[in-house]
Every structure is written in C-alpha cells, then in structure tokens.
UniProtKB/Swiss-Prot annotation:
<keyword id="KW-0346">Stress response</keyword>
<dbReference type="GO" id="GO:0009409">
    <property type="term" value="P:response to cold"/>
</dbReference>
<comment type="function">
    <text>Involved dehydration tolerance. Involved in the adaptive response of vascular plants to withstand water deficit. May possess chaperone-like activity under water deficit.</text>
</comment>
<dbReference type="GO" id="GO:0005507">
    <property type="term" value="F:copper ion binding"/>
</dbReference>
<feature type="region of interest" description="Disordered">
    <location>
        <begin position="1"/>
        <end position="108"/>
    </location>
</feature>
<dbReference type="GO" id="GO:0006970">
    <property type="term" value="P:response to osmotic stress"/>
</dbReference>
<dbReference type="InterPro" id="IPR005513">
    <property type="entry name" value="LEA_1"/>
</dbReference>
<feature type="compositionally biased region" description="Polar residues">
    <location>
        <begin position="1"/>
        <end position="12"/>
    </location>
</feature>
<protein>
    <recommendedName>
        <fullName>Late embryogenesis abundant protein 46</fullName>
    </recommendedName>
</protein>
<dbReference type="GO" id="GO:0048316">
    <property type="term" value="P:seed development"/>
</dbReference>
<feature type="compositionally biased region" description="Low complexity">
    <location>
        <begin position="82"/>
        <end position="91"/>
    </location>
</feature>
<comment type="similarity">
    <text>Belongs to the LEA type 1 family.</text>
</comment>
<dbReference type="GO" id="GO:0005829">
    <property type="term" value="C:cytosol"/>
</dbReference>
<dbReference type="GO" id="GO:0009414">
    <property type="term" value="P:response to water deprivation"/>
</dbReference>
<feature type="compositionally biased region" description="Basic and acidic residues">
    <location>
        <begin position="47"/>
        <end position="64"/>
    </location>
</feature>
<dbReference type="GO" id="GO:0016151">
    <property type="term" value="F:nickel cation binding"/>
</dbReference>
<dbReference type="GO" id="GO:0008270">
    <property type="term" value="F:zinc ion binding"/>
</dbReference>
Amino acid sequence: MQSMKETASNIAASAKSGMDKTKATLEEKAEKMKTRDPVQKQMATQVKEDKINQAEMQKRETRQHNAAMKEAAGAGTGLGLGTATHSTTGQVGHGTGTHQMSALPGHGTGQLTDRVVEGTAVTDPIGRNTGTGRTTAHNTHVGGGGATGYGTGGGYTG
C-alpha cells in the first residue's frame, strides 16, 4: 500500500513538474512576442529557466521525501505511531506522534515555496541512482558472469 502511495505521489510530482515547465516555456514565448527589446527577451528566458529549475527541484524533493518515508516505514525506526521525520539536510529529527510533518520547504508554515535558496544542492541518498547505471550500494561480488569471487568450485559449463 505504501509503495502504491509513493508511486502515485512520484507520478503526480512528475506531472506537476511537466506542467510547470510547459507553462514557463509558454509564458516565455508570449513575453518574447510582446517585446522587441533584447534585454527583455533575455530576462524572459532567464525567468523561464528559473521556473524550470524550481519545478525540477520540487519534483526531486518530493521523490526524496517519499523514498525517506518508505525507508523509515520499512526500517521500523520507532519514532512515534508509525511516523517518522525527514529533513532535507539529512538530519534525523524527533518523532511527531500523530502529527506528520512535511519535509517540503515552507509546507504548512506559511512561507513562500517558490524561492530557491542559493548555495543548496540536491543530493541522492546512499543506494540511489548515481547516474552511472549502478547505485552507490552496488555489490561487485554479485551478478554477471566471469569471476565474481563466489562459486561452487564445480566444472559445470552448461
């Protein structure tokens, strides 16, 4: 059940990100058609790129939050009544009892969520996609033919 919720949330985050990116592109095109000033056109392009980056960052944060919640639920961390906290800085917080807190920036606090904090970067948890086709938790002794370091010692060549 939790896996289905995570998948649905990830799909929704991707869809929202795609819509936000499309909206930013269309707004840029409309702004460029309104003006002849190259500075205004460049500003429209920069605004579009900022909105696209923000949409992508929100999608990644949602996916990371979902993955952290899945890991916390599977690990049985004992933080309250089946709840766990997750911080985007990687620090584990205190259990919140029956009040689930969100790791999304500004969510439930009244703060603006459409601003990017300079100097921050998105990181992947250990064992997640590193872009190399393998996770950081790859075991070199498992899988794929050749000498893996394990075997029966038999001579079967089937």
